[in-house]
Design a protein with these regions (language model features):
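Walker B catalytic acidic pair
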Residues: 93
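Active-site-proximal or metal-binding-adjacent scaffold patches in catalytic folds
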Residues: 1-88, 97-174
Length: 174
């Protein structure tokens, strides 16, 4: 199945789940299906998903889904291993689309209502996965064997935080 189909199916499932959350009853959840969905660049390592607003709309003036230009999700999140996390990402971005622009207490309380607890906690491992995928070398501590994936070589300029030993550059892949 193509990424577009996976994304559309996930969005439908997320909207159905959002309709079942009582705290979201008063919000225009049905309008979320009108928001165009897209993908981030494959080489993005820090951004997992984003809610992009219409040009000229200030974050403080956002009222609902009509102010949203599109929601983009990282294409790696649409693979089988990460689809549960992709569903949570869509939920997170749809909350932004409903007018909760910041990550304040209200937003975090609504975000915590997502039923898949494990998916809510997959962000750190997904970020590590993206960084490891993009890494050209690993800065490795010869003493404690801790690895730090990087795109540039360290050239002996960096030390391990715990051991204070100079990190070695280990080339990754072919």
């Amino acid at each position: 199945m193509s990424d577009e189909n996976v994304l559309a199916d996930l969005a439908k499932a997320v909207i159905v789940t959002m309709h079942q959350i009582p705290q979201l009853e008063q919000l225009p959840v049905h309008e979320l299906q009108k928001i165009p969905l897209g993908r981030l660049r494959r080489d993005a390592t820090r951004l997992h998903a984003v809610c992009r607003y219409q040009k000229g709309v200030k974050k403080s003036e956002i009222v609902g889904p009509n102010d949203v230009r599109c929601v983009d999700v990282h294409p790696v999140a649409l693979t089988d291993d990460w689809q549960r996390y992709a569903a949570f990402l869509l939920y997170h971005e749809f909350l932004h689309a409903l007018g909760f622009t910041g990550h304040d207490r209200t937003f975090r309380n609504l975000e915590a209502l997502w039923p898949d607890i494990e998916a809510r906690n997959m962000g750190k491992s997904f970020g590590n996965h993206l960084r490891r995928r993009a890494a050209k070398c690993l800065w490795t501590c010869p003493q404690c064997s801790k690895e730090h994936p990087r795109t540039r070589r360290g050239m002996g300029r960096y030390r391990c935080r715990e051991c204070r030993v100079v990190l070695l550059d280990v080339k990754v892949g072919p």
